[in-house]
């Protein structure tokens, strides 16, 4: 597992999140800060790092570091076909993504470790009148590792701006099952119901 301190990881994630928005020409008109809370403040600047390790008879969540709004449910072992695999639910206390949100997620599956990671529900990206929201995902699967990362769908609402960057690093003998689903928002609702 990586040797960076938790604080260094958070700072690196923050810097990366700032850059991905600035590097996107589509988002240049939306660099203004929302009136409520500027991006980078508590609850707007989420960070989650999960590390999984092989412990012989089963894999475990060996390390977790988080910043609001992320929470993680304790590991469950409910997959009968793979009883040694921990199943983890990522929970967000805000329940949605708002303008100015910056989220970073890092998942590292160590040598011969296994994990199933998902979310508690669909991620709703709400309407925005300023700025944008962004997400950076770094996923690493080491030799012999196996990861199922299947978050529930992302639902962007009208006038939302959401930038997501995902970096995948899978060793030659590692396996990753990854899904990303985007659904339209309330297409058939009346204008006043949005």
Regions found by a protein language model. Name each.
Residues 110, 142, 169-171, 179:
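Feature marks extracellular polysaccharide-active and adherence modules
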Residues 48, 103-105, 135-137, 145, ...:
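One face of beta-strands
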Residues 1-132, 188-194:
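Terminal catalytic/cofactor-binding subdomain
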Residues 133, 140-142, 184, 193-194:
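A structural signal for the main folded, soluble domain(s) of proteins
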Residues 146-148, 168-169, 175-176:
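Extracellular beta-strand scaffolds
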Residues 117-119, 148-151, 178-179:
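General beta-strand structural signal in soluble alpha/beta enzymes
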Residues 153-156, 161-163, 176, 180-194:
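Short acidic-hydrophobic catalytic motif
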């Amino acid at each position: 597992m990586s040797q960076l301190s938790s604080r260094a990881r958070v700072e690196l994630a923050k810097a990366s999140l700032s850059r991905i928005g600035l590097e996107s020409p589509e988002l240049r008109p939306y660099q203004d800060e929302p009136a409520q809370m500027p991006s980078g403040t508590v609850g707007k600047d989420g960070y989650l790092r999960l590390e999984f390790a092989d412990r012989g008879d089963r894999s475990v969540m060996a390390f977790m570091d988080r910043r609001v709004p992320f929470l993680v449910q304790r590991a469950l072992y409910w997959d009968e076909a793979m009883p040694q695999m921990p199943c983890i639910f990522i929970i967000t206390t805000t329940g949605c993504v708002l303008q100015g949100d910056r989220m970073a997620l890092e998942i590292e599956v160590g040598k011969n470790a296994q994990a199933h990671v998902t979310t508690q529900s669909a991620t709703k990206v709400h309407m925005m009148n300023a700025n944008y929201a962004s997400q950076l995902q770094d996923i690493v699967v080491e030799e012999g590792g196996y990861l199922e990362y299947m978050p529930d769908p992302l639902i962007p609402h009208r006038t939302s701006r959401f930038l997501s960057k995902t970096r995948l690093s899978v060793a030659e003998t590692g396996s990753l099952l990854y899904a990303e689903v985007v659904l339209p928002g309330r297409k058939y609702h009346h204008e006043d119901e949005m």
